[in-house]
A protein has these predicted regions:
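A charged helix-plus-loop insertion that forms the helical arch/lid used to bind
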Residues: 19-31
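Second-shell residues forming the walls of enzyme active-site clefts
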Residues: 80-231
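Glycine-rich anion/phosphate-binding loops
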Residues: 28-43, 75-80, 120-122
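Short glycine/serine-rich loop/turn segments
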Residues: 52-72, 96-115
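Glycine-rich, aromatic-flanked loop segments that form ligand/cofactor-binding clefts
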Residues: 1-20, 37-59, 78-102
Length: 253
């Protein structure tokens, strides 16, 4: 199985009892510290059987919800420090996850509570291509709508439920071939979207994180698969293959 955790430097000591004390992401002062923290966290995760870390946060820092969780105190550090965290994590046979695509750092509010909006250009997208090129294995998509953007407006839906963002931008334009996971599906930014499970999977996400009702989501996805045309079935089959390949690479199968 894939066992996951939000083991970010800024959250791990609160989330995992007995974990090795580490500095929060915004308190780190060098790329060497980033490497050391990633290795300490990964060592703890390996001891308890967690092989999928929803970290690092690669957003910019202005947003209060994610700012202290990212390396964005100095914008020039975001890409190299995130890459170091990713490489150190994956060297420990743990999947690393860059988040929150397409960018949570410059929106004003909290997607845990409600849908947030990027108005206009996607200024944080630039953080992702270098991480993709360097082999990050997973990317988490945020519950953020996009407005006034000619190519990627989401028509009021969160990015998690938008094929334009997940498939056309992340898969096709940026060329990401790894696992795409939603942010938690019980969050305020998506919970009130009707049939959000099937919308997220139809958009191209591979994994639904924490649906509010897992049984209902499973039934919804089964119905989606059985009642839709070949394009949806092909996309869902491809997601299953990506997950199986990842398990094989981790030595789980």
């Amino acid at each position: 199985f894939l066992f996951s955790a939000d083991a970010e430097p800024s959250l791990v000591n609160r989330k995992i009892m007995g974990s090795t004390p580490v500095k929060k992401a915004n308190e780190l002062n060098s790329i060497k510290e980033v490497e050391d923290v990633a290795n300490k966290i990964s060592g703890d995760l390996n001891k308890i059987g967690i092989n999928y870390n929803f970290s690092p946060v690669v957003d910019m820092s202005p947003n209060k919800t994610v700012g202290y969780r990212s390396f964005g105190k100095n914008p020039e550090n975001i890409i190299p420090w995130s890459n170091q965290f990713i490489q150190s994590t994956q060297a420990n046979n743990i999947i690393a996850t860059a988040k929150h695509f397409p960018g949570h750092g410059l929106v004003s509010g909290d997607t845990h509570k409600s849908l947030q909006v990027i108005n206009g250009p996607l200024k944080e997208i630039k953080n992702y291509p270098p991480l993709i090129e360097n082999g990050v294995l997973s990317i988490m998509v945020a519950h953020i709508a996009i407005e006034n953007n000619e190519n990627y407006s989401t028509q009021g839906l969160p990015s998690t439920c938008s094929k334009k963002v997940v498939t056309e931008l992340l898969r096709d334009t940026l060329g990401f071939k790894g696992l795409i996971v939603t942010d938690a599906m019980n969050m305020g930014g998506v919970a009130n979207v009707p049939k959000n499970a099937s919308k997220a999977i139809a958009a191209g996400c591979d994994i639904l994180l924490m649906p509010a009702d897992a049984r209902s989501a499973h039934s919804e996805l089964l119905q989606l698969y059985l009642s839709n045309e070949n394009e949806i079935q092909s996309s869902m089959n491809a997601s299953v293959k990506r997950i199986i390949r990842m398990k094989i690479c981790l030595g789980l199968l």
